[in-house]
Amino acid sequence: MGLTKKDIGLRIGAFGAEPWTESMRKEIEERLGLKGYNIYGLSEIMGPGVSYECQEQHGSHINEDHFYPEIINPETLERLPNGEVGELVFTTLTKEGMPLLRYRTKDLTSLMEGECPCG
């Protein structure tokens, strides 16, 4: 195409829909000259925008005014404490037409409590 990073002029990219590795992130950032951020969503809930990375990139912020997240043991279905890896489960708080109650995502992750350095 003959375009350079300067020609494109992108500074930020938000990427979702599929998991990516840190090496993939680094390659995209280097090739396009931008800072890449992860955005998480589920089409069953609302698509992108369930959670997103901030500039600190210490994990994703969940939009807790719309979603109640839990982590469960996928075999026993017992709720796990913060910091332990398990299956992510969501309850929607603001969907009126088709609310989801403890929707199992099949995604493995953990929840962190506390304040992010971004504020």
Model-derived features with residue positions:
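Active-site glycine/GP-rich loop and adjacent strand/helix microenvironment
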Residues: 1-119
